[in-house]
Amino acid sequence: MSSLGGGSQDAGGSSSSSNTNSSSGSGQKAGGTDKSTAVAATTAPTSVADDAPPPERRNKSGIISEPLNKSLRRSRPLSHYSSFGSSGGGGSMMGVESADKAAAAAASLLANGHDLAAAMAVDKSNPTSKHKSGAVASLLSKAERATELAAEGQLTLQQFAQSTEMLKRVVQEHLPLMSEAGAGLPDMEAVAGAEALNGQSDFPYLGAFPINPGLFIMTPAGVFLAESALHMAGLAEYPMQGELASAISSGKKKRKRCGMCAPCRRRINCEQCSSCRNRKTGHQICKFRKCEELKKKPSAALEKVMLPSGAAFRWFQ
């Protein structure tokens, strides 16, 4: 009986010990589950907070203000990261400090005009400054493009100024001197010359420059500048006289004067020599044996063109 009682006691002790062990094991398991649920409870708000959509941003009028860029629509304001970092502990505070340092470095790089690679290298260490690095990159690219456009515009203006200066020099070389032109010209021709110098011509492409359109010979082969036309049109050393202009504008095809030889370019009518006496008559002044211009082109047809200033102009084709 004693052995049976001891066996029962041993069985009861083992059962009690097993019960206590099982209860303690269950208590440890329960404690482990409680800890795991607590950890999950602590990590769940952070994941929910990260996955939750950003709050709607509204201005003072209550209108929702969303960024135009699609990649920035899910971005959060800086206050979200600062509040999350302050509740997270020392590591998050270090992250906020590094974010502030990265933002300050990016601003300094933008102000000093450094390269984009340096700004991206500073921003790679912090994931929260990706949007800032993108904004810095876009601003730097826009600034570089603006400087390139400004440089191209300056180069174009310089080339235009150089071409304009060269054209002005050519015009000044072919224009008559005012002292020589005003000595023997009649009043009407002097006024016409002043209008041709100071006013604009009827040609739209030559309106900005005082170029007489009579200097250009238009032929089927092209447009040429006549050297002898400078003398005959009165734009060179020996200008034409009023009588010659009236004689040419009468419509006669007979050649009266060449404008190149000494009798033709004589300004004052002496009324003694045959050349001066025949100026106002229908006789021919230039002779083939005296005038080199008529020897070169004896059968050339005489043509007449009315200039915008009112004076007649002729040249030999």
From Swiss-Prot:
Keywords: Cytoplasm, DNA-binding, Metal-binding, Nucleus, Zinc, Zinc-finger. Residues 11-27, 36-51 have a biased composition (Low complexity). Transmembrane segments: none annotated. It is found in: Nucleus; Cytoplasm. GO terms for biological process: negative regulation of transcription by RNA polymerase II; regulation of generation of precursor metabolites and energy. GO terms for cellular component: cytosol; nucleoplasm. The keyword Nucleus applies. A zinc finger (CXXC-type) spans 251-292. Pfam families: zf-CXXC. May indirectly participate in activation of the NF-kappa-B and MAPK pathways. Acts as a mediator of BMP4-mediated modulation of canonical Wnt signaling activity in neural stem cells. Required for DNA damage-induced ATM phosphorylation, p53 activation and cell cycle arrest. Involved in myelopoiesis. Binds to the oxygen responsive element of COX4I2 and represses its transcription under hypoxia conditions (4% oxygen), as well as normoxia conditions (20% oxygen). May repress COX4I2 transactivation induced by CHCHD2 and RBPJ. Interacts with DVL1. Interacts with RBPJ. This is CXXC-type zinc finger protein 5. It comes from Mus musculus.
